[in-house]
């Protein structure tokens, strides 16, 4: 049976860096760094989704980023603040802050400059199908684990178990990989992850409902944890 583990972060990053098309590289780079769903990145909605009232494109324009300075105690660091409109939450805005220094995150400056090139236009002016195609080409041969679960048929009250298995590595797997990295490498708590990745607080293990009043807190809460030299 296949090893039910995610690919190494370094393996995935190398694949992204060597993507053949520039827009593919930066699209996948943003999806990974932002812990984003595909619809939070892409700027166009396909005809099927429109007709069936499905996923709405919420992708950014080149104006959806700015630079700020983070200061606390002896720590002073420049950050690029990216605006992400959260899918499944009516486009609720969340801010993704990434260190500008390459020793903390070598992709931040590249992505920031790519945004600026697009001005008022959409940064990724294509549909999620194209994003999936880019992921399919870029991550060919990679897979990620799906834990066992139960399927429910409205015509059959008895749940049908589905065994743990592997799926081809695509855009949604980037979200899983980044979330795992934020927890295991950077020490994010469930609350930090809900603020960063746009999950509802009640969906995060270990985050009580009483914490919901603080969900508006911005990037300054989690940003110091990203100031960890890795590269």
Residue ranges and their predicted role:
Residues 31-77, 190-195:
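Short, charged phosphate-coordinating catalytic segments
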Residues 9, 23-25, 132, 172-176:
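Short, leucine-enriched amphipathic alpha-helices that occur as contiguous helical runs
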């Amino acid at each position: 049976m296949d090893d039910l583990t995610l690919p190494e972060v370094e393996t995935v990053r190398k694949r992204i860096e060597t993507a053949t098309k520039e827009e593919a590289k930066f699209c996948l780079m943003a999806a990974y760094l932002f812990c984003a769903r595909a619809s939070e990145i892409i700027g166009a909605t396909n005809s099927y989704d429109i007709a069936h009232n499905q996923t709405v494109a919420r992708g950014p324009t080149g104006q959806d980023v700015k630079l700020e300075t983070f200061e606390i105690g002896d720590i002073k660091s420049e950050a690029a603040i990216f605006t992400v409109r959260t899918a499944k939450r009516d486009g609720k805005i969340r801010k993704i802050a990434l260190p500008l220094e390459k020793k903390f995150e070598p992709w931040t400056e590249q992505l920031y400059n790519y945004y600026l090139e697009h001005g008022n236009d959409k940064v990724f002016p294509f549909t999620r199908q194209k994003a999936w195609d880019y992921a399919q080409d870029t991550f060919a041969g990679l897979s990620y684990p799906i834990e066992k679960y139960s399927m429910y048929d409205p015509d059959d009250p008895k749940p049908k178990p589905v065994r743990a298995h592997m799926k081809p590595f695509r855009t949604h797997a980037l979200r899983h990989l980044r979330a795992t990295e934020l927890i295991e490498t950077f020490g994010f708590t469930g609350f930090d992850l809900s603020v960063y990745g746009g999950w509802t607080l009640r969906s995060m293990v270990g985050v009580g409902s009483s914490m919901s009043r603080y969900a508006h807190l911005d990037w300054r809460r989690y940003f110091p944890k990203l100031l960890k030299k890795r590269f």
